[in-house]
Structures are given as C-alpha cells and as structure tokens.
Amino acid sequence: MGELMAFLLPLIIVLMVKHSNSRTHSLRYFRLGVSDPIRGVPEFISVGYVDSHPITTYDSVTQQKEPRAPWMAENLAPDHWERYTQLLRGWQQMFKVELKRLQRHYNHSGSHTYQRMIGCELLEDGSTTGFLQYAYDGQDFLIFNKDTLSWLAVDNVAHTIKRAWEANQHELQYQKNWLEEECIAWLKRFLEYGKDTLQRTEPPLVRVNRKETFPGVTTLFCKAHGFYPPEIYMTWMKNGEEIVQEMDYGDILPSGDGTYQTWASFELDPQSSNLYSCHVEHCGVHMVLQVPQESEAIPLVMKAVSGSIVFVIVLTGVGVLVWRRRPREQNGAVYLPTPD
C-alpha cells in the first residue's frame, strides 16, 4: 500500500499544478473507487491536499483517516481523526454501491473506476472558487455548478443521476455552502497550521542551454528548479515577442526535496539572427535571460540573502541578463563570481 500511495500522490500533484504567475492556495479532496482491483490496490482511496501537499489519507485496507503532514497531526485532536474515519467508511460503502450501479447502467464488467474531486481555492485578490465533480473510468461524468445549483451531465447515464440529485434542493444548497464557506474556513485554518511550509518562498535556479536534439536540429532549453511555491510563469521570446505556438512545456514536477522543477524549449533556426530570451516570473520577481547565438549555457542562480536578492551568473560565450523587479521592491542586485 505504501508503494501505491508513493506513486499516486506525485501523480495527483502533476495533475494539479499549472503554469501561472499568480499565487493561489487550494484545498482538494480526491476519492477513488475501483471495482475488481488488482492485488495491492485498495478498492477505495481518499487523499486530501493543501496546495500540492498531501495532508490526509484513507484507504479500504487501513480503514483509518491519517495525517500526512506533521502540522496536521500536531493541531488536530484524536477525535477529529476518529470522526472523519467513520465518515469515510460510509463513503467507502457508498462508492462501492454507486460503482456497481454505474457498471450495470453501462453493461460493464471487470475493473472500472469512479472518482470524486471536491475543493476550493483562495486567490491572490481574496476571491474564492469552489468545485465538485465526478468521473467514471477517468472521464468527466457529472460537474456541479454551485451558482445555478445544477449538475452538468455528459451522457444519458449521467442525466439519470442528474435528475435524481437535482430533486434534492437541500443537498444542492448544502454543497454550495460547503464549497463557499466551510471549505474556505478549513483552508485558512490549514494554511495557518502549516504556514512555515505552505507560505514560504524559495526562488528558482534557472539555466539556459542549447542542445542538438536531432541531426541539424538545435533546441534551446530554459530550465528552472529549486522553487516554491510551484506556481511559475516561463516563456521564450523572439525579438521581444512571445513564441507560444513554437514552444514545448514540461510539467511542473516535485523535485523530492519540497521544491519544484520545470522547463520550456523550442527549436532554434541555426541560420537566424534573431535575439531570443527566456522569461521567468515567480512570486513577483521577473528574470530575463537573453541568449545570443554563440552562447551555449547561461546558468542563473537567485538566492535571498539578508533581505536582498543575489544573482550569480556564469557565462559561456556572451550573454546578457536583464533584471526587473516590482516597483515596491527597491533592493539592488549584487553580482558575484563563481568557480568554473
């Protein structure tokens, strides 16, 4: 079971994290039911996240809701875990019944999955969002609209369930209130519990290099790693204009040490005299690496030192770093040599 969760948790993180330059906080709960699971796979799993950090787990093998973050264990009393353990045991049975019903409707046998995701987000400007949806075999099935108190159904089977659920107005209003009020209240509480982890900032280390990916094809890579939170914006520009259509992006992946990594690349025309630059924005700091054709690598290291920002640049060939910060931050940049 431990090996399965070690696989599932990073997978969910990859699905959650998006390229963005705005910092948001989220609380999400994922539930997964499996019919005829293979050996070692529980028939029911529930995982809770704050941002990209797992905070709780439950499965049909242990049948116990348990903390996944030390600050959750330290701040919530034993009766909290027991109360929600009992609730999740009920959800486990409900998922089993609902999955069997769906298989009958679709005339399916064998192994299938039924999933639920519920949660909320607290945006930088103080506004909030909430979401609740179900999936069958990994495909959207029912999606809740809290503003209209209705469900969006994707097929005839889902429409049958939609009509039954929409007949219960009390339950629809309860879900809306939970998404808009209770979920946000829990999120704020968890952010306070884990503030040393969840609200910290670690700036990215950025490197630009070129590589011959195929004979006659040169690719420019811009790679960022060691950053937290995972929200980051990265793009390539040609002569000051973004070249989105030509770019490939890597997923924002956990590095295994509590930080994240990602990359952006595009194929370079070796005969071109254009000026290319990689733009990275993270937590209000904007970095631009301009890459002349003859440069092969331009590593950039950004570290916070005594309240200021220190950039360390190593140039192979000729490169230019253009650095801009938000107007409210007036500290200068200090350039230091590094060994080869």
UniProtKB/Swiss-Prot annotation:
5-(2-oxoethylideneamino)-6-(D-ribitylamino)uracil binds at R31, S46, K65, R116, Y174, Q175. Disulfide bonds join C120-C183, C222-C278. 5-(2-oxopropylideneamino)-6-(D-ribitylamino)uracil binds at R31, S46, K65, R116, Y174, Q175. Pfam families: C1-set, MHC_I. GO terms for cellular component: early endosome membrane; endoplasmic reticulum membrane; external side of plasma membrane; extracellular space; Golgi membrane; late endosome membrane; MHC class I protein complex. Coiled coil: none annotated. Residues 294-302 are annotated as: Connecting peptide. The keyword Membrane applies. 2-amino-4-oxopteridine-6-carbaldehyde binds at K65. InterPro entries: Ig-like_dom, Ig-like_dom_sf, Ig-like_fold, Ig/MHC_CS, Ig_C1-set, MHC_class-I_related, MHC_I-like_Ag-recog, MHC_I-like_Ag-recog_sf. Pyridoxal binds at K65. Residues 203-282 form the Ig-like C1-type domain. Belongs to the MHC class I family. Heterotrimer that consists of MR1, B2M and metabolite antigen. Major classes of metabolite ligands presented by MR1 include riboflavin-related antigens, pyrimidines and ribityl lumazines, nucleobase adducts and folate derivatives. Forms reversible covalent Schiff base complexes with microbial pyrimidine-based metabolite, which serves as a molecular switch triggering complete folding, stable association with B2M and translocation of the ternary complex from endoplasmic reticulum to the plasma membrane. Alternatively, forms non-Schiff base complexes with ribityl lumazines. The alpha-1 domain is a structural part of antigen-binding cleft. The alpha-2 domain is a structural part of antigen-binding cleft. This is Major histocompatibility complex class I-related gene protein.
